[in-house]
Amino acid sequence: MAAAVVTKTAWKLQEIVAHSSNVSSLVLGKSTGRLLATGGDDCRVNVWSVNKPNCVMSLTGHTTPIESLQISAKEELIVAGSQSGSIRVWDLEAAKILRTLLGHKANICSLDFHPYGSFVASGSLDTDIKLWDVRRKGCIFKYKSHTQAVRCLRFSPDGKWLASAADDHTVKLWDLTAGKVMFEFTGHSGPVNVVEFHPSEYLLASGSSDRTIRFWDLEKFHVVSCIEEEATPVRCILFNPDGCCLYGGFQDSLRVYGWEPERCFDVVVVNWGKVADLSVCHNQLIGVSFAQSTVSSFVVDLSRVTKSGSVPHGLLRNNELLAQPTPTGSSLRRSYDRPSTSCSKPQRVKHSSESERRSPSSEEDRDEKESKAEIQNPEDYKEIFQPRNAISRTPPHINEPFPAPPEDEPITAKEAVKPNQPVEVQTPLPKQELPETFQRPPIASSTPMPRAEPSVIPAARNEPIGLKASDFLPALKNQSQAELTDEEIMSQIRKGHKTVCMVLTSRHKNLDTVRAVWSTSDMKNSVDAAVATNDLSVVVDLLNIVNQTASLWKLDLCTVVLPQIEKLLQSKYESYVQTGCTSLKLILQRFLPLITDILAAPPSVGVDITREERLHKCRLCYKQLKNISNIVKNKSGLSGRHGSAFRELHLLMAVLE
């Protein structure tokens, strides 16, 4: 009798080259989990069917890179926001642009469709939230309360509320009919990246860069619980459709949470890097991530994931396995009711001005004429969108779940998709023959051309930096070559190992030095010690800690850090640039008004040593900020996340010009 085939819990479904340039955003359709939209620096929106290699439709019209995307609940419409602040809505069934919406003054950071009405909400780097009527192609309401970029917007399931998350560390709940903030949730110590409503209960979840997930009661307006001490910032969360648990997408892992009390039900290792969006369908979770121009999709079999009951990983408190308390309160929390038809659209809307309510018609008409929906694959397009226009059949057609591949070998723990595991990639690859055994590399007859390195090395990458993959791959067949011995193969594998160990040992020693200074002295001396090591990686590690606590920043600390920030902003490593931008933003928000006020103040009568010292520090900081402002101005034209960060810094530094 044949043994039962053991299938994988998580596996890589597909990898595609989605754009001719870097991918800047993507989104999954939540209804079927089979529709994927990607936006790129090439100013295009490409629509894909998950697990199919070819682009179904390419939407053009934007003139700047795509910053945010959203697909409607019925997967009939798609909205895209660009770097310039323009918004375009396409009808996927009709394959044409529906509306062009203008009004924001900066990048579009977040978008969401109203669940019932023809409305779209948009959040921007300009801190405004706007509600648009797609049918009338105008802004019907503008919500102003946030002080920094609005990173996520979500309508409540009944369509009456709107939740917004922003870089100002707050989550706000808006009453659409009244046009005002119902409540402001505070508690996060870092930018809030994502919010999600529970599908049925009055419960809201928020994830932040402070590496916590907070659950908020929307009836009593208080925090229900908080999941802390995650390893990475929280950027992607999703409630299970039945509301039994919350999924958190983290760096190379999926975590399953409960909230009353806070606990982690399960952890599944998935090699998806920084996952960008999640969707649940047919008891499978689909996750998508992107790196440069490629998009990867992954599947997790939820039937093999613990979603309630036992707590295999224990409560998230001091990393100790505790007994599971009896859940309380969830059965008493109110549930959403679908509003009547008259409530499906906001009431008491205010039109501040006719010019704001409507976009300029001549410019809009021209943009809509230039916007196109290019059908790249007619067969897939008809299969996905045309059946909606046909007569419904009974029972209706339902997409089958993705088949799980078998395990490579028997194991006891849940296996992740391994980096070296062969994966079927359906993008065309150059044809070449590879031998089955290692062979000696051919002796080069001439000096090889150096490989061009990227101008910016991304934080998420598929291969180590500084290692040549060709050293570890089989070479082409050559009759004059002899097969490598096992010793020679191991020698190639170990190549560079000693160098890496020396680098890590030196870095560890430097960090120990900084930690020793920090434990016996103040923050400025710790930063001085980090700068003295002449190792930017140590400075980055220290700044990543300091950036989490704004109260640690002092004026004398700025004089030491600003020269290092200037170096970080010009680094080729993305993570260094991100840390430099975060530190500079904190300095500008906390100290730039103080610096300008002190420099503009008239000289005092008599001798004031304290004031003279403060004036000297302010002059030094001002000079350094002027130097950095030139770098920020030159880089503000970049596309993608870097460009957004530099443009925000450029706005904050406008007073220096």
From Swiss-Prot:
Descriptive protein name: Katanin p80 WD40 repeat-containing subunit B1
Polar residues composition bias: residue spans: 325-345
Any GO BP annotation: microtubule severing
Known partners and oligomeric status: Interacts with KATNA1. This interaction enhances the microtubule binding and severing activity of KATNA1 and also targets this activity to the centrosome.
InterPro entries on file: G-protein_beta_WD-40_rep, Katanin_C-terminal, KTNB1, WD40/YVTN_repeat-like_dom_sf, WD40_repeat_CS, WD40_repeat_dom_sf, WD40_rpt
Organism encoding this protein: Gallus gallus
Ranges occupied by WD repeats: 18-58, 61-100, 103-142, 145-184, 187-226, 229-269
Family that this chain belongs to: Belongs to the WD repeat KATNB1 family.
Gene Ontology cellular-component terms listed: centrosome; cytoplasm; katanin complex; microtubule; spindle; spindle pole
Gene name in the database record: KATNB1
Principal location listed in the UniProt entry: cytoplasm
Location of region: Disordered: 318-410, 423-454
Classification via PANTHER family: KATANIN P80 SUBUNIT (PTHR19845), KATANIN P80 WD40 REPEAT-CONTAINING SUBUNIT B1 (PTHR19845:SF0)
